[in-house]
């Protein structure tokens, strides 16, 4: 029995990145061997075991044979005669098909080290096309390693395009699509994930609401990049600069979906695109089974992001209505999330990237002023029932009016 470190741990150590988890392959053993040594079997479909002390995953070397559609249609063969090279051959990318012996020697039959050095994402074999989930994984790796200069090999992109064209992506479950997307949103370059999906034709299949934004123009005065699809990617990149919050990044991705509904004869104007986009956000989130808190923020951002751009000229009553609409009294984190997504929208434009966004701080300060007026003080003054809510609103509007009167007169930007 021989044991090898494989996959991401080897790849990340060679890249000088932190290794967060370790996966091992066991060659020349049976399940009975590992169970007798105290390992705990956890894989139902595949022979995967947990080490009795470290709790690392140890998998018996295996081969896989395509037996049906999608990413679950495989027959697994895990016997002591399966070699390490055979096990590595079934993996997605060459950079993930490098093994390290217990002595520290590398075993690299598919030249993954060379591709690491050259910053190339390349599939190991044509068996790549048997698993449609790998299209999303490559897009995610492209996003994760974009800051290191990684590019997708031409032949790998061609294979991904072929898979998208042949309809294999239709067999992916919503949960798997969202899981990969959620991971991609957490990378330093989430926009790259969606750009790769567009380049291979997968965006139109999995995210048609986003794909439909390409080719839709916006006024050049406010959007020198003109194309709404390009603007959307720029805003996602900006959101990643501003916040690590996946909720913020996803909401930014969806903020302009309503522009895809504007009749061409009305271009490049998109009046009412915010509220119009809410139903598209709902449909996208329902289809991919996006968690409710992420969905709810995305819907609010779609509806109200343009209002934040004009926040400095809003009347106190309108400001309070905005705070009520986003339920900021019970969910105060939404105030910061809305400020950040609106800033990402404003700065996610050609030549606007380094511009200040004073509306964000104005919104934050307005909320601070309004929140200093508490319901407890209203109750203490003897108000009861519905009168508490009405008096609380009146006092908050008054506080906002006093504060607003002290602010410098500014013109809003869009």
UniProtKB/Swiss-Prot annotation:
Annotated binding of ATP, by residue: 8, 11, 91, 137, 140
Cofactor dependency: Mg(2+); Ni(2+)
Q: Enumerate the spans annotated as HD domain.
A: 228-329
Q: Which Gene3D superfamilies match?
A: Beta Polymerase, domain 2, cca-adding enzyme, domain 2
Q: Which Pfam families match?
A: HD, PolyA_pol, PolyA_pol_RNAbd
Q: Which domain of life is it from?
A: Bacteria
Task: Please share the entry's free-text remark on the cofactor.
Answer: Magnesium is required for nucleotidyltransferase activity. Nickel for phosphatase activity.
SUPFAM superfamilies in UniProt: Nucleotidyltransferase, Poly A polymerase C-terminal region-like
Binding residues annotated for CTP, in chain numbering: 8, 11, 91, 137, 140
Q: Write down the chemical reaction(s) this protein catalyses.
A: a tRNA precursor + 2 CTP + ATP = a tRNA with a 3' CCA end + 3 diphosphate; a tRNA with a 3' CCA end + 2 CTP + ATP = a tRNA with a 3' CCACCA end + 3 diphosphate
EC number of this enzyme = 2.7.7.72, 3.1.3.-, 3.1.4.-
Tell me the Gene Ontology biological-process terms attached to this UniProt entry: RNA repair; tRNA 3'-terminal CCA addition
Identify a single GO molecular function assigned to this protein. Answer: magnesium ion binding
What's this chain's function?
Catalyzes the addition and repair of the essential 3'-terminal CCA sequence in tRNAs without using a nucleic acid template. Adds these three nucleotides in the order of C, C, and A to the tRNA nucleotide-73, using CTP and ATP as substrates and producing inorganic pyrophosphate. tRNA 3'-terminal CCA addition is required both for tRNA processing and repair. Also involved in tRNA surveillance by mediating tandem CCA addition to generate a CCACCA at the 3' terminus of unstable tRNAs. While stable tRNAs receive only 3'-terminal CCA, unstable tRNAs are marked with CCACCA and rapidly degraded.
Question: Which comment does the entry carry about domains?
Answer: Comprises two domains: an N-terminal domain containing the nucleotidyltransferase activity and a C-terminal HD domain associated with both phosphodiesterase and phosphatase activities.
Q: What else is known?
A: A single active site specifically recognizes both ATP and CTP and is responsible for their addition.
Q: Which family does it belong to?
A: Belongs to the tRNA nucleotidyltransferase/poly(A) polymerase family. Bacterial CCA-adding enzyme type 1 subfamily.
Query: Which HAMAP family does the record match to this protein?
Result: CCA_bact_type1, CCA_bact_type2
What is the protein named?
Multifunctional CCA protein
Q: State the organism of origin.
A: Pectobacterium atrosepticum (strain SCRI 1043 / ATCC BAA-672) (Erwinia carotovora subsp. atroseptica)
């Amino acid at each position: 029995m021989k044991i090898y470190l494989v996959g991401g741990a080897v790849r990340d150590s060679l890249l000088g990145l932190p290794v967060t988890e370790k996966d091992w392959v066991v060659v020349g053993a049976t399940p009975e061997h590992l169970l007798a040594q105290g390992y705990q079997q956890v894989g139902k479909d595949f022979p995967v075991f947990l080490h009795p002390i470290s709790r690392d995953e140890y998998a018996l070397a295996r081969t896989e044979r395509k037996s049906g559609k999608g990413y679950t249609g495989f027959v697994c063969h895990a016997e002591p005669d399966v070699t390490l090279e055979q096990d590595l051959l079934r993996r997605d990318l060459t950079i993930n098909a490098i093994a390290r012996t217990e002595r520290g020697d590398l075993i690299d039959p598919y030249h993954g080290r060379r591709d690491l050095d050259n910053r190339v994402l390349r599939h190991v074999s044509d068996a790549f096309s048997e698993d449609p989930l790998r299209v999303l994984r490559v897009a995610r790796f492209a996003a994760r390693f974009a800051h290191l200069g990684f590019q997708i090999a031409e032949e790998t992109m061609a294979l991904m395009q072929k898979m998208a064209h042949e309809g294999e992506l239709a067999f992916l479950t919503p949960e798997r699509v969202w899981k990969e997307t959620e991971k991609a949103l957490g990378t330093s370059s989430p926009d790259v994930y969606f750009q790769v999906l567009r380049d291979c034709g997968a965006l139109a299949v999995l995210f048609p609401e986003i794909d439909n934004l390409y080719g839709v123009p916006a006024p050049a005065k406010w959007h020198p990049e003109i194309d709404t699809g390009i603007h959307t990617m720029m805003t996602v990149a900006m959101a990643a600069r501003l916040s690590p919050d996946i909720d913020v990044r996803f909401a930014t991705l969806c903020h302009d979906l309503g522009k895809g509904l504007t009749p061409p004869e009305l271009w490049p104007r998109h009046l009412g695109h915010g509220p119009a986009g809410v139903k598209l956000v709902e449909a996208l989130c329902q289809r991919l089974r996006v968690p409710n808190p992420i969905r709810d923020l995305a819907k609010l951002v779609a509806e109200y992001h343009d209002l934040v751009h004009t926040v400095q000229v809003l009347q106190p009553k309108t400001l309070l209505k905005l705070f009520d609409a986003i339920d900021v009294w019970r969910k105060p984190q939404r105030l910061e999330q809305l400020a950040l997504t609106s800033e990402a929208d404003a700065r996610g434009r050609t030549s606007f990237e380094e511009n200040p966004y004073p509306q964000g701080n104005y919104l934050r300060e307005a909320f601070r002023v309004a929140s200093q007026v508490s319901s407890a003080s209203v109750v203490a003054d003897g108000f009861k029932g519905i009168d508490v809510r009405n008096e609380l609103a009146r006092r908050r509007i008054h506080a906002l009016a006093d504060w607003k009167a002290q602010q410098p007169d500014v013109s809003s930007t869009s």
